[in-house]
Amino acid sequence: MADLLFEIGAEEIPAGFVPGALRQLEDDLAKALADARLAHGEVRAVGTPRRLAVWARDVAPKQTDARTEAFGPPVAQAYDAEGKPTPAATGFARSQGVEVSALVRAQTPKGERVAVTKVEKGRKAEQVLPALLERLVAGLRFRKAMRSRFDEVTFARPVRWMVALLGGRPLKVRHGEVASGKVTYGHRFLAPKAIALKGTPDDYLAKLRRAHVLADPEERRAALLAELARAGKEAGGKVRDDPALVEQVLYLVEEPSAVVGEFERSNLELPPEVVISEMRNHQRYFAVVDGKGRLKNRFVAVSATRVKDPAVARHGYERVLRARLADARFFFEEDRKRKLHERIEDLGRRTFQAKLGSELDRAQRIGAVASGLARALGKDALVADLLEASRLAKVDLNTGMVGEFPELQGTMGAHYARLEGLKPEIADAIEDHYKPIGAAEEMPRSDLGALVAVADRLHSLVGIIGVGEKATGAADPFGLRRAAIGILRIVIARGYHLSLATAVEQTLDALAGVKLAAGRALVAEQVLDFLRGRVRAAWTERFDADLVEAVLAAGSDDVVDARRRLEALAEAKARPDFGSLAVAFKRVANIQEKAGGPGAAAVDPALLRDPAEQDLLAALEKVEQEVGARRAARDYPAVLRTVATLEPAVARFFDDVLVMAEDPALRANRLGLMRRVGALFSDLADFRKIQAEAPAQARAG
């Protein structure tokens, strides 16, 4: 057994490319070794902006032998009456590269056939690995790649060196004009000389560590966090928590070194989001806060190189930030010369989407949709504030500050609203209507912000789909998936029992002046299909797919209600008796469909001849009363527990009673009984879609 070590050294790879490339290397090498029949131990990838490396411990010295069996014609066609090979047999043997005498008889599902078993002897690992590693590096995919001017190969950035060692012995691997060797290189400035490697992962990490390179991202993360903690303390506070920035900086440096800087205290008069955005998004600096979380006029920058005089680096970082903050102060002061209401008409000169008109049109439609949603939810008292918040929600798009810092849309509008003395809830709604942002958990703080947020996303979703633009495959230029997910997350988080179909119709009403690419009914169905697709995708990440399908089939117009039904069904499925319950209710649902679907049905007790059907009706009448009250309260776990008590009676009914009796009156009465049983659960879930079977004991009984 020997360790395999493979490293690709390159010019600075963009930070966002490195984590994905390391995952690819790990997955692809493990799969390639398995496909090559080379046994191995741990496979792990590590890397920095200048190198991607992967190793496999304890690689077998040679491939395992491969046995393959090929089947030919039936024996009756392969041999004549005297047992001599026919042309069919000789032709098959020739195609397999063997003598006819090597053919054997084998039983197959298609009868007895001639066959040949071939054994491919395993080759030595050092013979297999060079081509395998060349395919590995050629198979790496990046969002953008560069082509060398000297050859046709591509990579994220030009490849400068490679290392390929098996048990310390070099393997001959090429990528374009670069051939592999057994030396790597340390930090570009602090240890640029070649470093000979023994080929083990531990040796690789240790030698690079001495050369100012922490190749293992987790080791580098620990060092980075320690540096940030030290620097925050030096700055008289602590570094503001920012996991996303930590992740980014982690792949910008090979050995982190933190430097504390300072900016003018007067810049703390700017909204803190402006200062933080300037530091983190434009300069990759970490903000420093005091014990109460208030911003200090300090920052921490992470350098890729430890310099002899930190003051030189600090001065450079401060100079760049000083200029950026001066620009921000200028935009802030200019913006404040005009009130938000004075900027509303400016939205008419800003196009939202060519076929959907201006941002002013958009703002007016958002107000109409938000008002309709409020009325549908019984929140009529919010309508006046919703119209005001909707008018102002997009106004900051025309400010200098948002023009310079697009990520602060909504945030700046809220700050300006507070400074102008507008209602705090209006200011909050201006900021909150963009939430949730991506996968962030932060949601709108109030109904006002939530309803404007839902209305904004509904307008985009219905409008964009309505004019014929759709999300296809990976392409979603208008962010329709993000809009749909945002709608669903807000509605569920706020517990809004809202009809999606009604909300879409209200949005189409607001878009009355827009020329749709298809009929109104078709557009509405396309939007609802799109929303259902997002519901399905989101819920199948957490719940069994069959349960999701069962719940959606029973209705998804009210997603809050559907989510509660799904959670109750998942809880029920975890119980040991669920299999029997599901099987029984599947049979009920199938018969119910034959009887004309769910609904009230007359059952004549006088026609119930069999004790099993009489007992079922008695149990049913008791359960119907209990279920009615619990369904009204949307207590679906209790509904399912109550309905489950019917399972023994239903099972006995199916065992003892012929539903499709020859007597039409008996048959209709029994079908009516099934319809009443089905009505208890048909609006909760379609049990026919649930994958479950009765326990073996129940089936045997």
From Swiss-Prot:
Keywords, alphabetical: Aminoacyl-tRNA synthetase, ATP-binding, Cytoplasm, Ligase, Nucleotide-binding, Protein biosynthesis
Q: Name one Pfam family in it.
A: tRNA_synt_2f
GO MF: arginine-tRNA ligase activity; ATP binding; glycine-tRNA ligase activity
Compartments reported by the entry: Cytoplasm
PROSITE patterns on file = AA_TRNA_LIGASE_II_GLYAB
> Which reactions appear under catalytic activity for this entry?
tRNA(Gly) + glycine + ATP = glycyl-tRNA(Gly) + AMP + diphosphate
Major enzyme class: ligase
Q: For this UniProt entry, what's an example GO CC term?
A: cytosol
GO term, biological process aspect, one: arginyl-tRNA aminoacylation
EC numbers: 6.1.1.14
Q: Which family does it belong to?
A: Belongs to the class-II aminoacyl-tRNA synthetase family.
Subunit structure of this entry? Tetramer of two alpha and two beta subunits.
The record's section on NCBIfam families has: glyS
Protein name listed in UniProt: Glycine--tRNA ligase beta subunit
**Which species is this record about?**
Anaeromyxobacter dehalogenans (strain 2CP-C)
